[in-house]
């Protein structure tokens, strides 16, 4: 085991040696099928396993108000099986799903008809003319009965069972603002199973246990709310963004009860089409191996109308914004955010370097100013740190003493203003570039994380953007970062949040 660890460390050390440090050549081979399906392969001859991923270009950006979290919910539903996987008697179950669809359509019609009576009119969610109608109660009872009958005919976790039975490991799924992905690591001779299951999931998913699965999201949301910082971070997201869906969390309490099979089916049928899908394989396969196999399972799918593009766009930055957050459970802090561009914009790679170079420097400045606290600089919104649309860079300072909030904010703002006028020491920038380069080469030797980065860049912009993105980080200078700060770290693009104990006066 010690020898293996030594060899692994040696491999990374060799990868980041100066002789090859700036070589980001990614041997990605691509084939685009007639129906628009994109296949990306990195061939690693001799490897006996294959990392397999399927990315769909859809996520929270594509949701509508009142349905926040619906994309994440769709991911859960797509684990419930298909017409061929997950049923003990599909013909009988099929009839129940048809009845469920009809009952839900009638329920939606009744909810719409009663919209004025049911509308929530209270700021504190405390006033409706009526909470229900007899017709609504009857339809919900019918849906519950049909659900129970259908559930008796379903099998739990059918797709997972098949993957595990044939040597699959690391089965995961993720839905974020811009993508949904499913992935698995399989033995070389079982890769065809991935194609069989994912093609079936893409065309024939059955939304079993719909209402029971809804409660899983409720539990996840409650888990998020148990973390003291969750609501503050969400409030900061809302402060920064007024129009972009990138800042919206995975559903509020009211959203979970609004999800309908009709809306989930609309998302599914709109976005899960071959011309909105990318397959990625890294391991002991070749492009020539994969092309006929992919054609076998996905080739019959028709190219469908292009899914509607995301049109949300933030207004131009025009004013400083501020949030005072009262909490006795969350540590006092100051957080300053600035909107930054999305991947594909030439400025975006520089923010990675700026964050890495400026964090340690800012920590030293804060300490020298007599402020006790910890600095963290990141570009995270909800769970993700890069987007194809504008998001934010977040300068966070968690304090030991709430009485230092004013002093801490002043020190932060002064140093941010200085950053736009005076370049950082060149050695800090060089160190940041080396740090990012090391992180990348650790990614490059791990097929799972490498495949994710390729897929993520494809949905944000293009997989071809990844290599120049890395090269741009390597070329960043202290003057580049000074110009970047001068352009973006301005008052009209600034959102400031402070966390105060509840007893501290205004």
PLM region descriptions:
Residues 259-266:
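A conserved hydrophobic secondary-structure block that centers on an alpha-helix together
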Residues 19-23:
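Boundary at the C-terminal end of the N-terminal hydrophobic targeting segment
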